[in-house]
Swiss-Prot record:
Protein's gene: rplJ
Alphabetical keyword list: Ribonucleoprotein, Ribosomal protein, RNA-binding, rRNA-binding
Keyword rRNA-binding: yes
Superkingdom classification of source: Bacteria
Its biological purpose: Forms part of the ribosomal stalk, playing a central role in the interaction of the ribosome with GTP-bound translation factors.
Family annotation (Gene3D superfamilies): 3.30.70.1730, 6.10.250.290
GO molecular function terms noted in the UniProt entry: large ribosomal subunit rRNA binding
Similarity comment: family membership: Belongs to the universal ribosomal protein uL10 family.
Pfam families: Ribosomal_L10
Listed name of the protein: Large ribosomal subunit protein uL10
Swiss-Prot/TrEMBL GO biological process terms: translation
GO cellular component assignments: ribonucleoprotein complex; ribosome
Subunit structure: Part of the ribosomal stalk of the 50S ribosomal subunit. The N-terminus interacts with L11 and the large rRNA to form the base of the stalk. The C-terminus forms an elongated spine to which L12 dimers bind in a sequential fashion forming a multimeric L10(L12)X complex.
Amino acid sequence: MNRSEKAAIIEQLKSRAEAASIAVVTDFKGMPVEELTRLRVKLRENGCEYHVVKNTLARIAFTGTAHEPIGTRFKENCAVALGFDDPVAVAKALTDFAKTSKLFAIRHGSLEGKALSADQVSDLAKLPSKPELLARALGTMNAVPTNFVSLFANIIRSLLYVLKDLESKKAAA
């Protein structure tokens, strides 16, 4: 690889890293190509990219980005997963894949500029996804007016029962 090719790779990786909300460094030593392809497909479904790149180029590319804390940790055979939409979905996809593959491991990551250990990435995977959190928040916000309306409906219903009872008593008398 000549200098211009390396510079192009660095620039491309740097621009993708700047746009990513999460970056996770993984170990893939000895994994067959079929498994790596399955991983890439799974990650793509979750709005993520998976790059296998030379450690030196990755270190240079991550310098000056929000994910700089992991830039110094590129050692041996590793690749980086960059997530753009939902960091939790990316962490879940990687954690699930790590459970099924003995040759794949999560090393560390970075979430919006903060370094994460492998355990923290696994903990992140246990959180509900962004759509689930939004649904819970909307459900909670919707519960207050619903309960309010139900309360007033019960009061009005009770008043109507009392009036109906009075009407039937007057009609009987």
